[in-house]
Amino acid sequence: MIQTDSFIEQLRDRLAAPLPGREAQFRMGFARRVEELRLNPLPPSEAKVACVLNLLHRREGAWHTLLIRRTVNPRDRHSGQVSFPGGRYEDSDGDLVNVALREAHEEVGVSPLEVQVLGRLTELYIPVSNYIVHPFVGVLLGKPDFTLQPGEVEAILTPPLSAFSNPDNRKITDLNVAQGVTLKGVPYFDVDGHIVWGATAMIMSEFMELLG
């Protein structure tokens, strides 16, 4: 694990070096989805682009990340799930990192001026929604003071990174993802009773391997 006294500098260096990549993501991926991604490693040309922000902040002597539970929305394929702040790329965004910063501002009230972006993780294609997700990693420069956007965010979660490094929190379950649709044997992180699975779990899997 990266040493605390130089955490930011070491993390920036590791993000600039070759990343753990897809295999690290696959360790927390649903088996059928992983098989699909292995068979078709290149996303379709018409895939949409989205970006998310893994926002780190220091609290009570430990490093934490920021997750949100999305509101229930029948038009959203990821309705009610736990995820990073993030959303779809818009032409006005320009650089991809601006998407992650904009969405963090809109969803949890964090000003882009309060975020130091350290780098990015491996992009990840989500077949069910046809999005290529670009994960960015940043650190909050000010004190944690988050405000959720009630139209999109039901709850804000700030788990310590230790919740993801603890092997006891890596579990498997069956998930009802839609009416009449149940996924069997889905790996997930149990974070204080919240199920963190899918793309978010895969991104965190690579991030935790990066930390070592």
Predicted feature locations:
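N-terminal leader/linker segments that precede catalytic domains of diphosphate-processing enzymes
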Residues: 1-83, 88-106, 110-134, 139-143, ...
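NUDIX/MutT-family hydrolases
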Residues: 148-190
